[in-house]
A protein has these predicted regions:
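Conserved ABC ATPase "signature" region
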Residues: 49, 53, 60-78
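Conserved catalytic motifs of ABC-family nucleotide-binding domains
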Residues: 103
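ABC ATPase "signature
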Residues: 166-167
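Conserved ABC transporter NBD signature motif
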Residues: 9-17, 25
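Catalytic Walker B motif of ABC-type/P-loop ATPase nucleotide-binding domains
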Residues: 107-110
Length: 172
């Protein structure tokens, strides 16, 4: 996700070399952290507005993308409520939404369904499947093998920081 500089090999993101053009690489990456990265005193709408402005999305376009995001995650009716009143699953959905506002080509997701209700989990799965069908590359970390089986067309198993196996589900 460009936080740590590579020490060997090559990384190209959306046609940009990470070492030579990290800014354009970053513009094409979305990151969903395991910890919720929202302001509890803000509404969902205001959180999306804040993060969208950080991506420098112009006003009218940003408002349209916020409305699309709220609709995608089924939170339009609660858009003006403070995030602190949301369930864990609702917070997760908005958290993912903040990483999608700038329409990245690659999305890194770290344990996006930890500790949430089944309805939110299924909605997140549906969104991930829709994004993938739309051409987005998703790097998904999980400890839940059934999630990897459902969502991933390639799987890597990491132990002590090293990839010990990788391939399709059938290959593994």
């Amino acid at each position: 996700s460009t936080i740590i500089k590579p020490d060997e090999g090559e990384v190209n993101i959306a046609g940009y070399d990470l070492k030579k053009n990290s800014l354009n690489c970053k513009k094409n990456i979305g990151v969903v952290t395991q910890e919720i990265a929202l302001y509890n005193e803000f509404s969902a709408y205001d959180n999306l507005l804040f993060w969208g402005s950080m991506y420098k999305i112009p006003g009218k376009e940003l408002k349209e993308r916020i409305d699309e995001t709220l609709d995608l995650f089924g939170l339009t009716d609660r858009k003006n409520d403070k995030v602190k009143t949301y369930s864990g699953g609702m917070k997760r959905r908005i958290n993912i939404g903040t990483a999608l506002l700038h329409r990245p080509k690659i999305l890194f997701m770290d344990e996006p369904t930890v500790g949430i209700d089944p309805q939110s989990r299924n909605l997140i799965f549906e969104v991930i499947e829709k994004l993938h069908k739309g051409g987005m590359t998703i790097v998904y970390t999980t400890h839940y093998m059934e999630e990897a089986e459902r969502l991933c067309n390639r799987i890597g198993i990491i132990d002590n920081g090293k990839i010990i196996a990788q391939g399709t589900l059938d290959e593994l």
